[in-house]
């Protein structure tokens, strides 16, 4: 039973009702809560507080259940790289990204090929072991191909007897017109020059075999590859039978750097001598197609010395004169077993060219990167040369010197009239009269100066003037895409145009034939024979 309200309680309820009605009329019902919010007083209701407390209790209970459940121990991940540890790869898979792994697989063959290219041929080898065709190597076929160049008719001094006879002839022919007619040469046309690629890279040396019945041109390039072109003189059939015939070219890689010089032995023209910038000296026999390793030129520290030029002595056909990329000079007797080599210093920088005076075989001329042309007497030794900054080797006596404005690229002697030609980066060709006693300043013996663009640049081999072995005529490539031929007086005899720059030249020693090699390994051949028709 509910107790009745007292008068005081009734009066209190009436006051509350009256106050609420008044607030409604004044629209101030939410003012108190608003004032609390502005004052920062918590206005959360007790109901809401109870809900929050209940939620906390439930979460705490769940957390305690999780901690009570058994947990599997997991290792903490750490970076071995940051810890400085080496990762052991037991499966042999490189620790690289997928993209890098694909690149590695793609370039593996190229890297293997590069390693092979950088590996030099050591010891005596057969060409058939180094040359592989689609059908494999065929030694009998290779021997048959070069058999005619191994004929004994071209050995035992016969070749040099012919040249000696030509050298003794007095050249009284002053008819310039006749000489120009003799060197009005025709370009070989059985194959086009862009088909005659005898090497893979830029040609650095050329050699024309002295055989007159059949032409053989040998070239070397910057990669150490030697190419032999067995020239076809017969025209191609017009009925289409020879449409698929290609130039007969054999390539073999002997060295790891530039092929510096290719020559044949004076007493046996069936054997070639080849030198390289990697210091190697090898022979190549055309009879058996075997290559013998003569030696690798090294200094006292067993470091290989790149061979820049070489020539057989006129006094002894078994002695080889050599110059190096470091400015050294030496003489090698090829009959003796390789022993410690004795060097003389002729320059503090690279010797780019060397030539022996045929009238005085004890005199040699050198053209160097130090901007000098010097003539030396190799019979006399100077212990401490004043001009050199080095004290490692003795030197020879200087006979005469010409100081050039820029480096001297080439030197070459005429066979009979005592003319020395040199050219260099000063865009000139200079002819000197070296007959008789020479003054200290070779410029006093200057015969003539020809303007010529000799600056070949990076992608073209250095242009070098070279005298023909049996005539007082020299040739030099032209940056205007031609071969220029002059006599020893500086009169121009021919201007043989080509499609590209035939930077490296090779004269035939007996015939008016000349070949030039360009920067892509291709050859331009000019002869005095009438062109054949395809």
Swiss-Prot record:
One of its GO terms (biological process) is regulation of DNA damage checkpoint. It comes from the Eukaryota. Pfam families: WD40. Keywords: DNA damage, DNA-binding, Repeat, WD repeat. Residues 39-80 are annotated as: Disordered. GO terms for cellular component: chromatin; cytoplasm; nuclear periphery. SUPFAM superfamilies: WD40 repeat-like. Residues 39-51 have a biased composition (Basic and acidic residues). WD repeats lie at residues 198-239, 254-294, 346-386, 403-442, 457-496, 498-534. GO terms for molecular function: DNA binding. Belongs to the WD repeat DDB2/WDR76 family. DNA-binding protein that binds to both single- and double-stranded DNA. Binds preferentially to UV-damaged DNA. May be involved in DNA-metabolic processes. This is DNA damage-binding protein CMR1. The lineage of its organism: Eukaryota, Fungi, Dikarya, Ascomycota, Saccharomycotina.
């Amino acid at each position: 039973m509910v107790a009745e309200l007292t008068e005081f309680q009734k009066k209190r309820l009436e006051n509350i009702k009256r106050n609420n009605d008044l607030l409604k009329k004044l629209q101030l019902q939410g003012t108190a809560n608003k004032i609390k919010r502005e004052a920062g007083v918590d206005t959360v209701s007790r109901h809401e507080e109870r809900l929050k407390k209940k939620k906390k209790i439930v979460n705490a209970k769940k957390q305690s259940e999780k901690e009570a459940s058994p947990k599997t121990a997991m290792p903490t991940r750490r970076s071995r790289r940051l810890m400085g540890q080496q990762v052991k790869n037991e499966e042999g898979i490189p620790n690289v990204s997928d993209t890098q792994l694909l690149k590695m697989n793609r370039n593996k063959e190229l890297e293997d090929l590069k390693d092979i290219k950088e590996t030099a041929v050591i010891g005596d080898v057969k060409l058939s072991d180094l040359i592989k065709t689609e059908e494999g190597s065929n030694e009998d076929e290779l021997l048959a191909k070069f058999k005619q160049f191994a004929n004994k008719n071209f050995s035992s001094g016969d070749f040099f007897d012919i040249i000696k006879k030509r050298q003794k002839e007095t050249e009284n022919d002053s008819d310039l017109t006749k000489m120009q007619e003799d060197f009005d040469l025709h370009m070989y046309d059985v194959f086009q020059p862009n088909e005659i690629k005898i090497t893979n890279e830029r040609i650095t040396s050329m050699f024309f075999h002295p055989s007159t019945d059949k032409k053989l041109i040998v070239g070397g390039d910057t990669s150490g590859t030697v190419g032999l072109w067995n020239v076809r003189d017969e025209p191609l059939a017009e009925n289409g039978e020879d449409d698929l015939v290609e130039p007969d070219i054999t390539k073999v890689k002997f060295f790891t750097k530039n092929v510096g010089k290719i020559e044949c032995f004076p007493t046996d023209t069936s054997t070639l001598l080849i030198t390289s910038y990697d210091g190697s000296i090898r022979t190549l026999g055309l009879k058996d197609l075997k290559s013998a390793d003569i030696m690798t030129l090294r200094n006292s520290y067993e470091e290989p010395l790149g061979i820049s030029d070489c020539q057989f002595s006129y006094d002894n056909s078994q002695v080889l004169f050599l110059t190096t990329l470091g400015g050294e000079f030496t003489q090698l007797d090829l009959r003796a077993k390789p022993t410690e080599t004795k060097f003389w210093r002729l320059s503090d920088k690279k010797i780019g060219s060397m030539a022996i005076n045929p009238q005085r075989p004890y005199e040699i001329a050198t053209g160097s990167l130090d901007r000098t042309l010097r003539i030396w007497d190799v019979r006399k030794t100077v212990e401490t040369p004043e001009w050199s900054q080095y004290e490692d080797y003795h030197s020879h006596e200087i006979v005469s010197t010409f100081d050039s404005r820029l480096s001297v690229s080439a030197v070459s002697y005429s066979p009979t009239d005592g003319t020395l030609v040199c050219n260099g980066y000063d865009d000139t060709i200079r002819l000197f009269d070296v007959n008789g006693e020479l003054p200290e300043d070779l410029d006093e013996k200057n015969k003539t100066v020809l303007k010529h663009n000799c600056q070949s640049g990076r992608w073209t081999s250095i242009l070098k003037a070279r005298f023909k072995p049996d005539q007082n005529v020299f040739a030099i490539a032209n940056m205007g895409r031609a071969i220029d031929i002059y006599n020893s007086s500086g009169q121009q005899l021919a201007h043989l145009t080509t499609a590209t720059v035939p930077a490296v030249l090779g004269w035939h020693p007996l015939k008016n034939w000349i070949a030039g090699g360009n920067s892509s390994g291709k050859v331009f051949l000019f002869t005095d024979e009438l062109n054949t028709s395809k």
